[in-house]
Each structure stands twice: as C-alpha cells, then as structure tokens.
C-alpha cells in the first residue's frame, strides 16, 4: 500500500510539474508576441515615408541598419562603450536605457538622441541619421601584405575590388568584420618587411620572452572593430592600417636576488581571450579575403593657417601619417609650421622614420622628432641623445614623448595655446597630453585626438 501510494503521489507531482511548465510556456509565447511583433516592422529614415525599411524585429537598431547596408560608425563593435552609433529616434525607440545615459547629456536625450547598439527594434520606428552615412560602403578586400613594423604592430594593407575607390578624408577610419573564427598564435608570421636590415628575426625574441606563441583566440560570433587608416587619399585603392595585437593582461611574480633586491618576472597571462580583431588581422596572409566598411571619421585636418603639432605613440601612428602625407604629398603645404613628435620604447618600435625624414628634406616647414622611453635599451640601441632641439648630432630624445615635447619646445614657445594639436597613441599617452595642454591653457578648439587608433 505504501508503494502504491508513493507511485500515485509521484504521478500527481509529475502531472502538476508538466502543467506548470505548459502554462509558463504559453505565457512566455504570449508575452513574446506582445514584446516582439511576429511580422515585419517599418523604419522610416530621415522622413522618407515612401521607402521605409521593412525589417524583422528583435535585433539592435545598429545590427538591423547594417543588414540594410546602412553602416553607422561603431568603434567598439556594438558593445555600448564608444557611443559613436548615435542617431535620433523620434518614435518607436522605447525608454532611454541606463547604458545610454552614461553617454548622453540631458539636452541630447531631450532631442531624441539614442545609442543605436543599445536600442532593440520592437515596433515601427522613425529615425534620423546624418546624410553622409549613406556614402559608407562595404567591400570584400584582398590582403596585399601584412608585415610587422614594430614588435606588436602590423602594417596591414588590403586592396579594394577592381574599379572601387574609398573616398575619405585623411584621419578617417574603417571597420573590419571578424567572422566566427579560431586563431592560434603559433601560426602567426611576424616577419618585418624584407628590406628591414634587422632581418626576419627582428621581433621574435620578445614574442618568445612573452610566450605569445601559446595564445589562442576564439570568436564564437561575428563582430567588427574600427581602425584608423594610415594611408592618405592619394595612395590608390588600398587601405593601410597599423594594428597592435591585444594580448590578455599579464601576470607577474616577484622573486628576490641573493642581495635581497625584489625582481618582477613575467608569469603568463590571465585566462582571458586575446583581442578578437587584432588576433584575426595578425593571422591574415597575402591573398586572404577581409570584409571592411567605410569611410567613417571626424578626426580631420582643420582648414586654418595655425601652427600644427602632432604627437604620437604606438599604433597611434596611423591617422597621423595619413594627415601628414596628405598635407605634404598632396597639398604641398609650405605656409604652416608643422612638427611631429613620436615616441617608442626602443629603436625597434620606431617605424616610418625614413619616410618622415624625406618630408623634412623637401619641406623646411616640417620637423620630425623621436624619443625612446626605455633607458635600459639605450646602449644596446646605440642611441645618441639630443641635448636640445638645436642639437644636430643627437639622433633623438629620451623620455616620454609629451614631456620631451614640453621640455624641448613648448616651454619656450611664446604662444603654445595658439598651436593646433593633433594626437593619437596609447591611453596613458593621450591622458598625459590632455593634462599637459590643459595646464598650458590650450582651448578645446585647438585640440583634436583620435581615441581608439592607438
């Protein structure tokens, strides 16, 4: 009897459980019908009621527009951190989300400004976007070359399809699509250009020391990332990028010498995925196909006659090279004083130096200044330090580039606040330059920087 009763109780419990699950499933389906329409919804763009976009609901507005070949800029790949995919949503966008309020002022919210990657398409919408967005295209490009120009930086060159051109302003950027892909770092080629006098092993020792060959990147879903172009408009139907590989955060261990001195030693990486797009790019070989879209950007040359000072480091070289090559190779500018201050850890981190020295020879109004920050490498690099800006014997300076610029030029300048400053580099460099310019009293209208190129 006890066993029979237990079986009946178990059967009743199962029946109740199944019934509850069925009720919840029906409720979920009904809720989904209310929250996400089952048919297409329409998106009216810039008041064009005659040609609305008919789309499936459920995805972000950024993704939906991309599927319709309308490519809003997004340096973070839709992660909600860069806020570059702003647009006006006049109806159908729902309430502004907390993730958007971090990037929008009260005035912008009142003007219906939204962050497209954070807005889900659930109903008919009316939106406004800048007209220049319609000039953005997407191509399947072919990799021409992919050499290392520094230890962790590639010069990545792709060719557009025959007959296609990328009409852009110097300082613009493109977005690279990254497919579902796994990348094994041991298969990467980090050779410099064949003409490099250091030879094919130039960067291998540091990759060995930092155990980069053992890293693996897994990308489970399509993504995209933004990179500033290093080429200028007159360089044909190519896109040239300087991309730094993003390794996981390193781990360190501390040991003591027999003398009791504490030494920090590299101890591998945290279990974090390497940079998705940078790993993907580093793995590309000549002939491979890569999808890019563009042009985007707002880091452009200002049409004034003011003196220009450029400050760069790392992969921040890219948009600055684009500017300077356009200024001197295309515009042939002779009536503006221009200087470029670029810093690296050691000699092997400097690149394009010969190209800028050639511009110096041709244009007396341009000067190029370089500095190394790793003092431990100076002797091995055979570096001859400049005593000051008038020292013709020294090769370059020693120190962080913003401090080198301040000590050797800006401090003695009669009106540093009247100079236009253009800069791009690692986050710490950008922050240091911003503080320096603020201390000098430079107004915002004389400051332009690219915050993701480095």
Please place each PLM-identified region on the residue numbering.
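Reductase modules of NAD(P)H-dependent flavoproteins
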Residues: 2-78, 89-110, 334-454
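Fe-S ferredoxin-like electron-transfer domains
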Residues: 26-34, 102-159, 164, 184
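Cysteine-centered iron-sulfur cluster-binding motifs in ferredoxin-type domains/subunits
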Residues: 73-83, 116-120
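Ferredoxin-reductase
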Residues: 144-285, 344-345, 371-375
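A short, basic/flexible loop-to-alpha-helix module at the beginning of a structural domain
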Residues: 280, 293-306
């Amino acid at each position: 009897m006890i066993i029979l009763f237990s079986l009946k109780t178990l059967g009743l419990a199962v029946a109740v459980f199944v019934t509850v699950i069925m009720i919840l499933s029906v409720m979920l389906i009904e809720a989904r019908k209310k929250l996400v329409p089952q048919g297409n919804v329409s998106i009216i763009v810039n008041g064009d009621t005659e040609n609305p976009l008919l789309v499936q609901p459920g995805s972000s507005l950024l993704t939906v527009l991309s599927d319709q070949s309308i490519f809003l800029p997004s340096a973070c790949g839709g992660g909600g951190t860069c806020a570059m995919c702003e647009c006006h949503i006049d109806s159908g966008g729902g309430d502004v989300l907390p993730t958007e309020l971090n990037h929008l002022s009260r005035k912008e919210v009142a003007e219906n400004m939204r962050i497209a990657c954070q807005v889900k398409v659930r109903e008919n919408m009316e939106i406004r976007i800048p007209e220049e967005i319609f000039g953005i295209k997407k191509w399947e490009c072919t990799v021409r070359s992919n050499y290392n120009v520094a230890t962790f930086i590639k010069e990545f060159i792709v060719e557009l399809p025959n007959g296609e051109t990328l009409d852009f302003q110097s300082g613009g950027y493109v977005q690279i699509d990254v497919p579902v892909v796994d990348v094994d770092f041991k298969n990467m080629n980090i050779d410099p250009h064949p003409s490099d006098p250091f030879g094919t092993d130039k960067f291998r020792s540091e990759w060995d020391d930092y155990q980069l060959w053992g890293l693996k990147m897994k990308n489970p879903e399509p993504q995209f990332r933004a990179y500033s172009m290093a080429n200028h408009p007159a360089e044909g139907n190519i896109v040239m990028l300087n991309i730094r590989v993003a390794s996981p955060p390193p781990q360190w261990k501390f040991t003591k010498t027999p003398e009791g001195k504490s030494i920090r030693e590299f101890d591998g990486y945290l279990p974090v995925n390497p940079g998705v797009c940078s790993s993907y790019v580093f793995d590309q070989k000549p002939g491979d196909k890569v999808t890019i879209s563009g042009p985007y950007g707002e880091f452009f040359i200002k049409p004034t006659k003011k003196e220009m000072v450029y400050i760069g480091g790392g992969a921040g070289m890219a948009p600055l090279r684009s500017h300077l090559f356009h200024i001197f190779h295309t515009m042939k500018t002779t009536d503006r004083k221009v200087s470029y201050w670029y810093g690296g850890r050691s000699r092997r981190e400097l690149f394009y130096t010969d190209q800028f020295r050639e511009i110096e020879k041709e244009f007396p109004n341009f000067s190029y200044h370089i500095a190394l920050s790793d003092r431990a490498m100076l002797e091995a690099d055979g570096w001859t330090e400049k005593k000051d800006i008038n020292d013709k014997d020294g090769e370059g300076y020693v120190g962080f580039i913003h401090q080198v610029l301040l000590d050797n030029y800006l401090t003695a300048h009669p009106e540093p606040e009247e100079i236009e400053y253009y800069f791009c580099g690692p986050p710490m460099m950008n922050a240091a330059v911003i503080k320096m310019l603020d201390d000098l009293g430079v107004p915002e209208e004389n400051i332009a920087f690219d915050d993701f190129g480095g």
